[in-house]
A protein has these predicted regions:
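Beta-hairpin (beta-strand-turn-beta-strand) motif
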Residues: 58-60, 111-113, 126-129
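Active-site environment of non-heme Fe oxygenases that use a 2-His-1-carboxylate facial triad
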Residues: 1-34, 103-106, 117-318, 323-329, ...
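Membrane-interface amphipathic segments in extracytoplasmic regions
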Residues: 41, 64, 87-88
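Active-site-flanking structural segment that lines cofactor/substrate pockets
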Residues: 28-46
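Polymerase palm active-site segment centered on the conserved acidic dipeptide of motif C
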Residues: 76-87, 207-211, 317
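Membrane helical hairpin/interfacial module
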Residues: 50-52, 56-81
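A gly/proline- and charged-residue-enriched helix-loop-helix capping module
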Residues: 78-110
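Beta-strand elements within well-structured catalytic alpha/beta cores of enzymes
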Residues: 47, 53-56, 326-329
Length: 352
């Protein structure tokens, strides 16, 4: 099998690398299953050192094929999802990566950092590559933690992260908000408030759960900014501040416009700036659909967030998808996101 694959790597501007195994023979699920079986040691080594590996040229074409491939890598797949991104279930263990509109950027994040037991492994496959854009960039969050200005990192370490979420409910009542991506019944897959409360209690991270008028739910949770990698002990930037902060969208769109020069991104950046300014005037932090502060309620300094985004983008590897690609990620080391795109795109995800 080794003579039918080429091994290479993609590189970030800061020198981070992601390993790539490209098949030269006929594609197909049997070839991918054989590769995983024969190269399990290589795959585990790449995950332990570089944190991710891309398997290219195997021609995955359906969610069912991807589930079989993901199960070959990690037999114990999971399917409970308490995240904020809209996703559709395609098989019992495969979901659409996100149902957000194509113009909407998804900032870098390790999956479900705000839960007690985040996934250990994350796997994506590209079944239909976008005509332009739509990359799923990867960032080594160990390198981000090490590269942060010590003063900025210290403020995050001392201050921690406090996530504020205000959800509408199954009645659909309440104000419209572009920052509210799901209702609470969609996240928890129930309309029973007692079940929601039990699921939140099981996580052990929520300091406030409050039901409000109009069928609304407020959740506040507290988290550390960094986490020690469970195998190496390395410090990892492991939180959602760069995703959930009110300024996340304009911060991402400005950098995307600088990268692509697309007028769509420029227009969306300016719109997001104006929308965020209006939201700040109209509602306190506690009432925002999605926002985060430090643990004591103090706002995170804008300059600290901008520095964090700069470091993340410097370590970003953003290679275009090809049809049939599959990437395996150590979720405790490597983050992912999504760049805007044009044309049809289908990227699917599984985790363990």
């Amino acid at each position: 099998m080794s003579d039918t694959c080429d091994f290479s790597a993609f590189r970030s501007p800061a020198g981070d690398t992601v390993s790539v195994a490209t098949r030269r023979g006929d594609p197909g699920l049997p070839a991918l299953l054989e590769f995983v079986d024969h190269h399990r040691g290589w795959l585990q080594d790449q995950l332990a050192t570089r944190g991710a590996a891309l398997l290219r040229g195997f021609g995955l074409a359906t969610p069912a094929q991807f589930e079989a491939a993901a199960r070959a890598v990690e037999p114990e797949l999971k399917n409970e999802y308490l995240g904020t991104s809209p996703r559709d279930a395609l098989t019992p263990y495969v979901f659409s990566a996100s149902e957000l509109p194509p113009y909407y950027p998804i900032p870098q994040h390790c999956e479900m950092t705000f839960l007690k037991d985040p996934p250990r492994r994350l796997m994506f496959a590209c079944l239909v590559a976008a005509r332009r854009g739509g990359e799923t960039p990867l960032v080594d969050m160990r390198r981000v933690a090490a590269d942060l200005d010590p003063a900025v990192r210290g403020r995050f370490e001392r201050g921690g992260i406090r996530i504020i979420r205000n959800y509408g409910g199954p009645s659909g009542a309440g104000r419209f908000d572009l920052w509210q991506l799901k209702r609470w019944d969609e996240i928890f897959q129930t309309t029973d408030r007692a079940v929601v409360e039990a699921k939140c209690a099981a996580q052990g991270v929520f300091t406030d759960l409050r039901w409000g008028p109009g069928d609304r739910l407020r959740l506040i949770s507290e988290h550390e900014a960094l986490r020690a990698h469970p195998e190496t002990g390395e410090a990892v930037w492991f939180n959602h501040s760069q995703v959930f902060h009110l300024s996340a969208a304009p911060g991402e769109l400005r950098r995307i416009y600088a990268r692509t020069g697309e007028l769509r991104s420029l227009a969306l950046w300016r719109f997001a700036q104006a929308a965020v300014a209006a939201k700040r005037r109209l509602a306190a932090s506690e009432d925002q659909a999605l926002h985060c502060t430090h643990r004591d309620g103090q706002e995170i300094a804008a300059a600290d967030l901008e520095h964090l985004r700069d470091v993340i983008w410097r370590h970003m590897i953003a290679e275009p998808w090809q049809n049939g690609d599959m990437v395996v990620i150590d979720n405790f080391a490597i983050s992912h996101g999504r760049l805007p795109y044009h044309g049809p795109r289908q990227v699917v995800v599984a985790w363990a």
